[in-house]
Amino acid sequence: MRAVTERYNGGMPEFNLTHHFLVAMPTIQEGVFAGTLTYICEHNENGALGIVVNRPINLTLGEMFDQINIPLRQSELSNCLVHFGGPVQAERGFVLHEPQGDWESTLLINAKLALTTSKDILEVIGEGRGPRNMVITLGYAGWDQGQLEHEITENVWLTIPASEHILFELPPEGRLPAAMSLLGVDYSSLVEDVGHA
């Protein structure tokens, strides 16, 4: 199975990694992306945008909603952790969600998923009428034109077609191993192999 969709473009394959996971290869042992699973929300000729989906931070939704003065009426959400989404705009909230809905500032990813940055979605979440499935992050990961493609050729990232099951039905610590299992690879053994290469 191909992990990347290719189109022929003047002798060079053009990759479209929208709705794919990026796994940080174990050679990245330091920095913000070490051990991360990143979901690519948009990838085109201008670059790529994704959010890290397996790195919760020490901030609950209840605390975040208090900080932005939005009541959170769904008590079961108040202890859910916000995630580190990436180093770009690290103070801004991003909501990856299903179903899409109609929001003021939304990037439609595919027929099921969207990434929303406007406050209206947070207000509806606070009222208990928000999307059924969601991951809320602070910040995102961004790549300039050609940067992600170059990093992939340098073996910085492994690409895997994304799964809503992994995004929304597994705890953060289970997402990376589950994504790797789609390829039949145990991430922990991959990490050990790098240490012995």
Regions found by a protein language model. Give the residues of each.
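A short aromatic-anchored loop/beta-hairpin motif
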Residues: 2-136, 141-197
